[in-house]
Design a protein with these regions (language model features):
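Catalytic histidine neighborhood in serine/cysteine hydrolases
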Residues: 192-207
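Hydrophobic, aromatic-rich cap/lid helix
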Residues: 137-163, 179
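Catalytic histidine-centered segment of alpha/beta-hydrolase-like enzymes
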Residues: 205-217
Length: 225
């Protein structure tokens, strides 16, 4: 593996892996570590090119991040885990569950999306404009190249067909804010496409784990316990 992940860990028991969103790092879950660690061994990872985890030389896309997660679990002797992913982290978790179902006990998808069309236009259009501009200057500026890669995740990934989600057999919770930047009908499509998935819409925007942690944590624990 071309990188070594930075991560924070707290608690004992069955592993619960937390995956942050685009441009974030493991500190996003500051309001989850303590309450969730009362029941689980909670591991929050900085994904490739985020936080203190280096960019490395491998491709910078959701499927590579899912491969990275597999290597992280193998390297830390984690045979199976609950996986909670937020935003792009939710997309990583979704792709990982499809590729390695035997490694996922329960799955939580928070603010995930199948493709760029799942994001409200008021959010997605500026992202796509920023992506085009960053690509224009990527060869001249390391900062522009980094921005192009990060924005590219939200323009080009994960491109999962909803029919594929029928292959996810583990218990799944799909959770989002009632004012999320992900379209409500898109979140519901994800939940409806996964057999037996639970859907929870709670007050808040895209960042409910950080902005409405008490309600979010309650929903997560009710699902996991």
């Amino acid at each position: 593996m071309d990188i070594k992940h930075h991560y924070i860990e707290k608690g004992n028991g069955f592993p619960l892996i937390l995956l942050h969103g685009n441009g974030e790092d493991c500190s996003y879950f500051e309001h989850q570590m303590e309450p969730l660690s009362e029941h689980f061994r909670v591991i929050a990872i900085d994904t490739r090119g985020h936080g203190q985890t280096p960019r490395g030389t491998a491709p910078f896309n959701i499927r590579q991040f899912a491969r990275d997660l597999l290597e992280f679990m193998d390297g830390h002797n984690i045979e199976k885990a609950h996986i909670l992913g937020f935003s792009d982290g939710g997309n990583i978790a979704m792709v990982f569950a499809l590729a390695h179902p035997e490694r996922v006990e329960k799955l939580i998808l928070n603010g995930a999306n199948l493709n760029a069309k799942g994001v409200k236009p008021s959010v997605q259009i500026p992202i796509e404009i920023g992506y085009r501009i960053a690509r224009m200057f990527a060869s001249k500026s390391p900062e522009a190249k980094q921005n192009a890669e990060l924005l590219g995740l939200m323009v080009n990934d994960p491109n999962v067909n909803p029919e594929e989600l029928s292959q996810i057999k583990c218990p799944t919770l799909v959770i989002a804010g009632n004012k999320d930047m992900i379209k409500d009908k898109h979140t519901r499509l994800i939940a409806q496409s996964i057999p037996g998935a639970q859907l929870s819409i709670i007050p808040g925007n895209h960042f409910i784990a950080n902005k409405n942690p008490e309600t979010f944590n309650q929903a997560v624990l009710e699902f996991l316990l």
